[in-house]
A protein has these predicted regions:
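C-terminal substrate-binding/catalytic lobe of Rossmann-fold NAD(P)-dependent oxidoreductases
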Residues: 2-28, 41, 110-212
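Anion (oxyanion) recognition and catalysis
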Residues: 10, 53, 78, 109
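Hydrophobic beta-strand scaffold residues
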Residues: 16, 59-60, 84
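Short amphipathic alpha-helix with an adjacent loop that forms part of the alpha/beta core around
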Residues: 25-33, 75-76
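Rossmann-like NAD(P)-binding element
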Residues: 29-47, 57-61
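A short helix-to-beta-strand connector/capping loop
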Residues: 32, 79-82, 146
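Rossmann-fold NAD(P)-binding glycine/threonine-rich loop
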Residues: 43-46, 50, 63-106
Length: 212
């Protein structure tokens, strides 16, 4: 993802201060002037989030797989006063799907619909279910009152496909998103980075998009 983000930044004429796999090697004086976009691994983010909060102007996190320390991370960013935007998926299209699924779930509540989520990704993806599928499941449960089962598939080089199904005795509704490449995730992360100007606190990307 790092190379994708670099490509989007170059395309938009945004200066890249540093692109590194060792964030702790960055000069703290430089870091304080920069927004960092983190697409690493769950273990790397867990090890580095305090350094990111302590040293950077703002932080955008696209890494998933740190749900078990989410409360701790958010609390620390508030404690040190560094703005942070995080998301399981920065694709603008996926975030539109989040909003659509939320609305449909609310409408269908009490009418006998059973939800199910299917997600397919490339074989290199470390987490299953995907962070996006977990967000979708949370949205469905909140609106419909039923927690959906999730089916995860890992095959080939699939960038990411998510399908949310609502099935009743009389019909079936499908809401889906298929990524053609990973560039959409990078574009959304750059959008998030531009949102950090004058931002305070910790925010999930989908909420900022809905309330813009």
């Amino acid at each position: 993802m790092g190379h994708m983000v670099e490509g989007v930044l170059h395309k938009q004429g945004i200066e890249i201060a540093s692109a590194t796999e060792d964030v702790c090697s960055i000069d703290p004086a430089l870091a304080k002037q920069c927004v960092v976009i983190d697409f690493t691994t769950p273990d790397a983010f867990k090890a580095n989030y305090r350094f990111l909060a302590d040293n950077f102007k703002a932080v955008v996190v696209g890494t998933t797989g740190w749900d078990e320390i989410k409360t701790e991370v958010i609390s620390y960013f508030y404690q040190v006063g560094t703005p942070m935007i995080y998301s399981a998926n920065f694709s603008i299209g996926v975030n539109a799907v989040f909003a659509a699924v939320a609305k449909v779930s609310e409408i269908l509540k009490g009418y006998g619909y059973v939800p199910h989520i299917e997600e397919t990704h490339h074989v290199h993806k470390l987490d299953a279910p995907s962070g996006t599928a977990k967000v979708l499941a949370s949205i469905v449960k909140s609106g419909l009152g039923i927690a959906p089962d999730i089916t995860s598939v890992r095959q080939g080089e699939v960038p990411g496909t998510h399908v949310v199904k609502f099935k009743s005795e009389v019909d079936k509704i499908k809401i889906s998103h298929e990524a053609f490449s990973r560039e959409g995730f990078a574009e959304g992360a750059v959008v998030a980075a531009t949102m950090t100007e004058d931002l305070k606190g910790v925010h999930e990307f989908k909420e900022l998009l809905l309330n813009k």
